[in-house]
């Protein structure tokens, strides 16, 4: 009989023995492996926290008590324990459950996450709200050691300690960043100190020593120094105690018989407490334990062998082209340095890091620092290339404006995962960068339509004396044969790809490919539609675009970005400034967060594939007035 299938709510965990909970942990791991082997997802992180998740739900009264998961990569066991077993096979699929905690999905999901280092801030805010209402519920932030490289986490630790809030922070140390398990003695010392009685006795002893005549304060200082020296010698606890937290741990995150009592003791303590739990990423699946980075975010794989199913041949990815090209460029230009924020492999920079270790910087999950660090490099004559996912560049917006663009520094931004990314959904789609970059003074923004244009954009970036960004998508490139050498692009110059007399499509970025196919479809219906690749979001090629708009009288803009403030808006502004009365249809993403699904499903749903573009143009041409996505200038 399956314990997982019969579990109605996490409250039932309180009635199970440790042996039964261990059986349940095994069933959860099996279900996660079975599902992710089919759907893909964040496997290693979730396998590493199965026992921790069980222990938290065993000790806490969820959903009254709240667990805030940092990033959310590790939340699969949490989802299985909180009523989503029957839908777990839809994980990360169109219309299915999210790969991250999502408040609208379950009352057990306390906070929507997807980006790193936010959990302590959110949980602290919830604790402050509780105190305003004189509540008693508990709030727990679960954060990985990698996420602690984000400065926001330390900002929250600082406030929590200063305000002495009742808050529990679980540091999930999966041996990837901070520390190894530091041994039995340290574990024993700290585990003994979790007892509520011991903590109370410790405080009473401090009070007693403090009141001893004449020498009391000196005795108290000596006692505290002795305690700190002993613990600091064996553990990293002093760091967190300096923030005003009581430190507990390290604890073995896979031993329920010790983890549960420790958490029960911690739950009754006053003030902020940090519990250091050591886990193994990929626990229970040998291939993931041996290669946790590969199985961090993984596609479908063979669950018997762990072999990841290779995609069907085809061209290299845009990311791969970027990485190999930058490595080759760095051989010819020793000013080029590469910077990423804990995304070495994701941004394609592994080979660069091996070839040029002194010119490669992984700054951790610290996008703000990455950008200003690059600004410092640029000040001293280097040509830094900051490689970030579009969604994470959002976190460094002020640094882009204030520290780079304001000084017109030659920093290049390689914006990966631009546009719709697929199964990771709304937290990871890169659909706002056109809008938040194009209004920044001194900024040049390029959206290459293919891998050759990407190479040209990269060369342009390292030659340009000012900030420049180029944006490319997730997934395979077009399969074009790459030349031995490329030329840089003239700033602000687009290219006409196809002539036509009835209308013109301005398609920015990789949607050029779909626009050309749409033009073919429409040609078969008797409509002659030109296609222009503007290349540059900023500055626009006004001479080319205005000439084409004036010639045809009908303009269609296509972009893989929200329509608000994006490329279509830039074209409208240009035409309005010119006083040119033409009909304009903007095709892009609507004013809402876009759900998860495959890239192809989402392109079709939002009319960004060839058929969708052709249908929109057809309808626009056959009606005197367009739909809500169109704008007429008169």
Swiss-Prot record:
InterPro entries the record matches: Dxylulose-5-P_synthase (IPR005477), THDP-binding (IPR029061), Transketo_C/PFOR_II (IPR009014), Transketolase-like_Pyr-bd (IPR005475), Transketolase_BS (IPR020826), Transketolase_C (IPR033248), Transketolase_CS (IPR049557)
Protein name: 1-deoxy-D-xylulose-5-phosphate synthase
Recorded name of the encoding gene: dxs
Keyword Metal-binding appears in the UniProt entry: yes
Binding annotation for Mg(2+): 145, 174
SUPFAM superfamilies per UniProt: Thiamin diphosphate-binding fold (THDP-binding) (SSF52518), TK C-terminal domain-like (SSF52922)
One Pfam family of this chain: Transket_pyr
HAMAP family listed in its UniProt record: DXP_synth (MF_00315)
GO biological process: 1-deoxy-D-xylulose 5-phosphate biosynthetic process; isopentenyl diphosphate biosynthetic process, methylerythritol 4-phosphate pathway; terpenoid biosynthetic process; thiamine biosynthetic process
UniProt pathway annotation: Metabolic intermediate biosynthesis; 1-deoxy-D-xylulose 5-phosphate biosynthesis; 1-deoxy-D-xylulose 5-phosphate from D-glyceraldehyde 3-phosphate and pyruvate: step 1/1
UniProt cofactor(s): Mg(2+); thiamine diphosphate
Subunit structure and binding partners: Homodimer.
CDD domains, per the entry: TPP_DXS, TPP_PYR_DXS_TK_like
UniProt-listed PROSITE patterns: TRANSKETOLASE_1, TRANSKETOLASE_2
EC number from the UniProt entry: 2.2.1.7
Gene3D superfamilies, per database record: 3.40.50.920, 3.40.50.970
Free-text comment on the cofactor: Binds 1 Mg(2+) ion per subunit. Binds 1 thiamine pyrophosphate per subunit.
